[in-house]
Regions:
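Transmembrane and membrane-interface helices of multi-pass
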Residues: 1-189
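Membrane-interface soluble catalytic domains
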Residues: 5-9, 64, 136-140, 151-157, ...
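Generic structural signal for small/hydrophobic residues in well-ordered secondary structure
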Residues: 43, 248-250, 292, 317, ...
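Active-site-proximal alpha/beta segments of enzymes that process anionic O-linked groups
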Residues: 159-411, 521, 534
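A long, amphipathic alpha-helix that forms part
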Residues: 191, 366-373, 408-454
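Stable alpha-helical elements in mature extracytoplasmic
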Residues: 259-263, 309-313, 360, 364-368, ...
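A short beta-strand-to-alpha-helix junction
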Residues: 304-309, 421-434, 479-485, 498-515, ...
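Histidine-centered active-site microenvironments of extracellular/periplasmic hydrolases
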Residues: 446, 450-495, 545
Length: 614
C-alpha cells in the first residue's frame, strides 16, 4: 500500500493536467477568482476520486505483483483515457460523457468512425497502458522512500486534502451569495458535486447579508442567451396585458366541469383554446417553471442559476414598461427563482405569510386583487399567480367536502398497494378549492374591463401521480410518464387565438409559451431560435417527434411510444410510456437532436434547431 500511494499521487497530477483541456474550450472566459478556485477544485476533486479508486483496488494487494500491476495499469489507463475523451465530448457538446452519449456513438445511427480513428484509439490505449505500467514498475522497484521523499509525499497529501476542503467551503460560500464566477466552474469538471448548505451559511450570516450578485453583462457566463440582441417592438405596437395562472402539481384530468367548474366555465365563456397533449418541461417545479418562463429545456437550470441569468421574457416586459406583479404561495426563493427568472425584478415579493398552502393561496389571491385594482392602468400589466394547494393536498378545514371518500395523506405509508381513491379525492378537493379562489380573479378581469386586452395562460408546473402506473410512484419528480408531466394548458385572449386551434391537438410544451408571446404580443422581431428552442403556436407544428424533459437530477427524451431517461450518473434507461423497461433500441436520431437542444445556448455560433441538427 505504501508504494501504491505514490502511484496514485502521480495519477492525480496527470489527471489534473488533462483536465486543463476542459477550461480551454472556445469562448471560455474566467474571472481571476474562478481561475484560482478551479486549481483547488480540480486537485481536490481528483484527490477524492483516486482515493476512492485506491480503496476499491485494495484487494489487489493479495495478488502477485506482476498480475496486480497489469490490472492496475489497465484500470488507471482507462480512467485517464476516459477523462481525455470526456474533454473532447465537452468541447463539442458542453456536457460530460455519459451512458447515453456512449450508446448514441456506438449505435451506428449517428456517428461512423473511420479506420484511422480506431487506429488512433488503439495507439492511445497502448501508450496509456505502457505509461501506467512503467510508473508502477518504477514505484515498486526503483523508488526508495527516503525521509525527504516521504516528506514530499506527506506535503503533497496535505496540499491535496486542503484543496479538497478549500474548494468545497469556497463553493458553499459562493453558492450562498450567488457569486457566479465561482459557481460556473462546476460545469467544467466531470462528476463534480461541490458542497452547498444554506443552513450552515445562514448560521454565520447573522446580519442577513445574503444577496444575489447579478451582473447584467456577465462575461464569465459562457451561455449565449440570446444568440443575438433582441429587437423589441420597433413599430411601437400596443402590447397586451398578460397573466399566468399556474397551479403546482396540476393533473391534466382535473381540469373538468366537476373538479374545476369556475375555470372550466370561464374558459368556455371566453372561447379559450384548450390543448389536449400539452406537457411540462419537467416533473418538478424547478424545471417546469424554468421552461415556462425561458422557453428552453430545464437542463439549462444549473448554468442559469450559477450565472444569475434572467428570463428574456421578463426583461422584455420590463423594457416595455409593464406593471409586473409576482404572487407565489410558496417561497419564490425555493427553488431559486429569485436568482434566475425574476432576478432583475426589484422589491420582489419573496413569500407569503406562514400558514397552510390553502391559506397562502387565499393570501396571494387577496394580494393580487389589491395590487391589480391599484395598478397604473395606463401601462400594460403582467402578473403571475402560483398556487400551491394541490401540491400539498390542502384545503381549509371548514370546507364542504365534495369528493368522498377522502383520506389523510401520509407519505410514510404510501406504497403500491395503497388505495388511491381517498388520496385522489383529497387532491381533487384542493384543486376545487383553488378553483373557487380563481373565480375572484376571473371576476376582477371582467369587472375591470381588462379581459379583452389580456392574454390569460392557465396551466400547471408539472402533474401529480396517484400510482397511475402501478409501480408505487406517488406525487412527482419520480418518472416522466403522463401522470407526472402532462398538464392542463389553456390560452384565453381574443379572436386572434382562432389561429392556434390547429395546434390544440398536437404535441405542445411549456417551451412554446415564451416564443409565442414574445413574437405575437411583445413584438420581438428576432428569429425564435435566437432565444428559444420552442415552437410558435400560431404556426402549424409539424414533425415534432419528441419532447425534452428534466428534473433536479435527470432528463428524458419522450416520444409518442417511449421514454429515454438519463439519470444523474449518466446511466440511461429505455422505457415504455408507463415507465417499464423495454429491450428495444431507441431512436438515437431523436436523442441526438435533443442533445443538440441541450447544448444550443452553450455554443457561440447559431446552428439550426430543425429536426436534422448538425
Amino acid at each position: 500500500m505504501k508504494k501504491l500511494y505514490p502511484f496514485v499521487l502521480i495519477n492525480i497530477f496527470i489527471s489534473s493536467i488533462i483536465a486543463i483541456r476542459f477550461f480551454l474550450v472556445p469562448e471560455a472566459s474566467f474571472h481571476w477568482s474562478a481561475m484560482v478556485f478551479s486549481i483547488f477544485a480540480v486537485l481536490g476533486h481528483f484527490f477524492s476520486a483516486y482515493l476512492l479508486l485506491l480503496i476499491i483496488c485494495t484487494p489487489l494487494l493479495l495478488l502477485k505483483q506482476f498480475i496486480r500491476n497489469i490490472i492496475l495499469a489497465i484500470l488507471f489507463s482507462f480512467f485517464q483515457i476516459g477523462l481525455y475523451i470526456d474533454t473532447i465530448v465537452f468541447e463539442q457538446y458542453r456536457f460530460h460523457i455519459n451512458q447515453s452519449v456512449l450508446s448514441m456513438v456506438f449505435s451506428g445511427q449517428i456517428v461512423d468512425f473511420s479506420m484511422l480513428t480506431y487506429l488512433l484509439m488503439l495507439v492511445l490505449i497502448v501508450i496509456s497502458f505502457c505509461a501506467e505500467y512503467f510508473i508502477l514498475y518504477f514505484v515498486n522497484n526503483k523508488l526508495v522512500l527516503s525521509q525527504k521523499k516521504s516528506k514530499i509525499i506527506l506535503l503533497s497529501t496535505i496540499f491535496l486534502f486542503s484543496s479538497f476542503l478549500i474548494s468545497h467551503v469556497v463553493h458553499m460560500i459562493a453558492f450562498y451569495y450567488a457569486y457566479s464566477p465561482i459557481m460556473a466552474v462546476k460545469e467544467y469538471i466531470p462528476l463534480y458535486r461541490p458542497f452547498t448548505s444554506k443552513k450552515i451559511m445562514s448560521f454565520f450570516d447573522v446580519n442577513g447579508q445574503r444577496k444575489v450578485v447579478y451582473n447584467k453583462n456577465n462575461s464569465n457566463a459562457n451561455v449565449y442567451y440570446p444568440k443575438n440582441p433582441l429587437v423589441i417592438n420597433p413599430d411601437n405596437n400596443k402590447p397586451k396585458n398578460i397573466i399566468f395562472i399556474v397551479l403546482d402539481s396540476w393533473r391534466y384530468d382535473t381540469f373538468s366541469e366537476e373538479i374545476s367548474p369556475n375555470t372550466f366555465r370561464f374558459v368556455k365563456q371566453n372561447n379559450g383554446v384548450v390543448f389536449d397533449k400539452h406537457y411540462s418541461t419537467g416533473n418538478a417545479t424547478r424545471t417546469g417553471i424554468f421552461g415556462l418562463f425561458y422557453g428552453i429545456p430545464g437542463t439549462y437550470w444549473d448554468a442559469f442559476l450559477r450565472n444569475s441569468i434572467p428570463s428574456l421574457f421578463i426583461t422584455t416586459l420590463q423594457k416595455e414598461n409593464y406593471n409586473i406583479g409576482i404572487f407565489t404561495s410558496a417561497k419564490v426563493s425555493a427553488p431559486e427563482f429569485d436568482r434566475t427568472v425574476f432576478v432583475t425584478i426589484k422589491n420582489l415579493r419573496i413569500s407569503s405569510k406562514d400558514g397552510s398552502a390553502s391559506s397562502r393561496d387565499k393570501q396571494i389571491t387577496d394580494d393580487w386583487l389589491a395590487w391589480y385594482k391599484t395598478r397604473d392602468a395606463s401601462k400594460p400589466t403582467f402578473s403571475f399567480l402560483f398556487y400551491d394547494a394541490p401540491h400539498a393536498y390542502d384545503f381549509p378545514a371548514d370546507s364542504l367536502v365534495k369528493f368522498k371518500p377522502i383520506g389523510d395523506l401520509n407519505y410514510m405509508t404510501l406504497n403500491n398497494d395503497t388505495d388511491p381513491l381517498p388520496i385522489f379525492n383529497r387532491y381533487k378537493q384542493s384543486v376545487y378549492y383553488d378553483d373557487s379562489l380563481l373565480q375572484n380573479v376571473y371576476d376582477e378581469l371582467v369587472k375591470s374591463n381588462s379581459l379583452e386586452d389580456t392574454i390569460v395562460v392557465i396551466t400547471g408546473d408539472h402533474s401529480q401521480e396517484m400510482n397511475d402506473n402501478k409501480l408505487g410512484f406517488w406525487g412527482h419528480n419520480g418518472n416522466y410518464t403522463d401522470a407526472q408531466t402532462k398538464v392542463p394548458f389553456i390560452i384565453i385572449g381574443g379572436k386572434e387565438l382562432e389561429k392556434i386551434k390547429g395546434n390544440s391537438r398536437k404535441l405542445t410544451s411549456h417551451e412554446d409559451v415564451v416564443p409565442t408571446l414574445m413574437k405575437h404580443y411583445l413584438y420581438v422581431k428576432n428569429d425564435i431560435s435566437d432565444y428559444s428552442t420552442g415552437y410558435d403556436l400560431f404556426s402549424s407544428i409539424v414533425d415534432r417527434n419528441w419532447l425534452l424533459m428534466s428534473n433536479y437530477s435527470s432528463y428524458a427524451v419522450k416520444t409518442s411510444s417511449d421514454i429515454y431517461l438519463v439519470n444523474r450518473l449518466g446511466i440511461s434507461h429505455h422505457m415504455d410510456l408507463h415507465n417499464r423497461e423495454i429491450n428495444e433500441t431507441p431512436n438515437y436520431q431523436y436523442i441526438y437532436e435533443a442533445m443538440n437542444h441541450m447544448r444550443y445556448f452553450f455554443q457561440p455560433e447559431k446552428n439550426s434547431l430543425s429536426n436534422k441538427l448538425d
